[in-house]
């Protein structure tokens, strides 16, 4: 599976995604109220209430997340909480440029920015 596609959207199963990304850590940034685009995130399984959209990039119809190495692109824009994300094997995942979306994600933990260890911030610092 190549992540270099720019004009096409790759779609894969959660099981294949997990196999290909074994050992990769995924995150989502959240607002204080845990609501983003009218969806309220909770610990545990989160399933989008909008029909999953595999046709359009950066669109409704999917719950977005990114890998740790791309966190520097998003941390300033989406609130002051960091959620650790896992993907269920029965999910559908779209691979977009620098991010992913899925019809369902599992939030394992939610941490306020003030409580996130310094090593995380050092690790995600953009290296140009």
Regions found by a protein language model. Give the residues of each.
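Generic low-polarity alpha-helical segments
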Residues: 1, 63-64, 125-128
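ADP-ribose/NAD+-binding catalytic cleft of ART/PARP-like enzymes
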Residues: 2-60
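ADP-ribosyltransferase catalytic core
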Residues: 49-113
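Active-site-proximal loop/hinge segments that shape catalytic or ion-binding/gating pockets
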Residues: 111-128
């Amino acid at each position: 599976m190549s992540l270099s596609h720019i004009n096409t959207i790759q779609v894969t199963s959660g099981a294949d995604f997990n196999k290909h990304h074994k050992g990769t850590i995924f995150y989502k940034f959240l607002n204080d109220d845990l609501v983003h685009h009218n969806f309220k995130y909770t610990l545990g399984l989160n399933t989008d209430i909008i029909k999953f959209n595999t046709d359009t990039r950066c669109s409704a119809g999917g719950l977005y997340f990114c890998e740790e190495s791309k966190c520097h692109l998003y941390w300033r824009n989406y609130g002051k909480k960091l959620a650790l994300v896992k993907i269920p094997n029965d999910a559908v995942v779209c691979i977009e440029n620098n991010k992913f979306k899925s019809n369902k994600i599992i939030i394992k933990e939610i941490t306020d920015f003030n409580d996130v260890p310094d090593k995380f911030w050092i690790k995600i610092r953009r290296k140009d």
